[in-house]
Amino acid sequence: MMEKIRLILLSSRPISWINTAYPFGLAYLLNAGEIDWLFWLGIVFFLIPYNIAMYGINDVFDYESDMRNPRKGGVEGAVLPKSSHSTLLWASAISTIPFLVILFIFGTWMSSLWLTLSVLAVIAYSAPKLRFKERPFIDALTSSTHFTSPALIGATITGTSPSAAMWIALGSFFLWGMASQILGAVQDVNADREANLSSIATVIGARGAIRLSVVLYLLAAVLVTTLPNPAWIIGIAILTYVFNAARFWNITDASCEQANRSWKVFLWLNYFVGAVITILLIAIHQI
């Protein structure tokens, strides 16, 4: 049993849990202005069960291509034996359904709408016949929805409406999400082509994809600077993503695997930028 739990948690990418739990918690706190049981329920859901489902479904239906991908098998993606696939799918359902029921019951019609979109995006990204991850450009939009939707749910679940400033921040976050998905796809161009998989990066090439990623990161930084002072500090923090991706501005399809270096930096940049945002918000609150 402990081995099964270990494999399930490995598949859920613990290093990336913060990317979904933090947006929910931050949006909830900014809009509701308080921490209650619903806040903690959402945090727990988007921290672990949500990621078990999102990455678990992906690992099951991407098994054949992941076997050919040298970067899979660690923090960047588990390659679980086929004997574990049914367990992983059951875990995805069992761990999420109770949380979903409560979030639907105690949420608002608007948060329920975003929650429905979030669940559909998680399933559609990897599930057979839908496979949004193999539909160029839709793949980036869907992946970004995975990370933006928790924030939208957090911002609307208590009955308050997001302010204009929050919508701008969410727009910046959505651009960040698209840029990040494209950055991740660059390193897999050759592996995906060998497995006959399509992605935005296989269609426009590694160089085109990395440059699009840089542009989207830059737009995200510019958009957030339109918010009231001192949002420009967050804009500067986002520029670290721009510089990280821009290092590979002239990458080619033949050398696409080199982009893995930027992806490894990206995983840790999330913690740095998250810390900057947190410290900034604490400082503003104290002022």
From Swiss-Prot:
This protein's record includes keyword Transmembrane: yes
Q: Which Pfam families match?
A: UbiA
GO MF, one annotated term = transferase activity, transferring alkyl or aryl (other than methyl) groups
Question: Does this UniProt record's set of keywords contain Transferase?
Answer: yes
Membrane topology term reads: Multi-pass membrane protein
A cellular component term, taken from the record's GO annotations: plasma membrane
Write out the annotated subcellular location.
Answer: Cell membrane
Q: What happens when the gene is disrupted?
A: Mutant accumulates lycopene and cannot produce neither flavuxanthin nor decaprenoxanthin.
- Where is it predominantly found? membrane
The record ties this protein, via Gene3D superfamilies, to: UbiA prenyltransferase
Q: Which residues cross the membrane?
A: 15-35, 37-57, 87-107, 137-157, 166-186, 218-238, 265-285
Provide the alphabetized UniProt keywords. Answer: Cell membrane, Membrane, Transferase, Transmembrane, Transmembrane helix
**Documented EC number(s):** 2.5.1.149
Q: Which reaction does it catalyse?
A: all-trans-lycopene + dimethylallyl diphosphate + A + H2O = nonaflavuxanthin + AH2 + diphosphate; nonaflavuxanthin + dimethylallyl diphosphate + A + H2O = flavuxanthin + AH2 + diphosphate
Cystine pairs annotated here are none
Q: In which pathway does it act?
A: Carotenoid biosynthesis
Q: Which family does it belong to?
A: Belongs to the UbiA prenyltransferase family.
Record function comment: Catalyzes the elongation of the C(40) carotenoid all-trans-lycopene to the acyclic C(50) carotenoid flavuxanthin during decaprenoxanthin biosynthesis. The enzyme acts at both ends of the substrate, forming the C(50) carotenoid flavuxanthin via the C(45) intermediate nonaflavuxanthin.
Q: Name it.
A: Lycopene elongase/hydratase
**What organism does this protein naturally occur in?**
Corynebacterium glutamicum (strain ATCC 13032 / DSM 20300 / JCM 1318 / BCRC 11384 / CCUG 27702 / LMG 3730 / NBRC 12168 / NCIMB 10025 / NRRL B-2784 / 534)
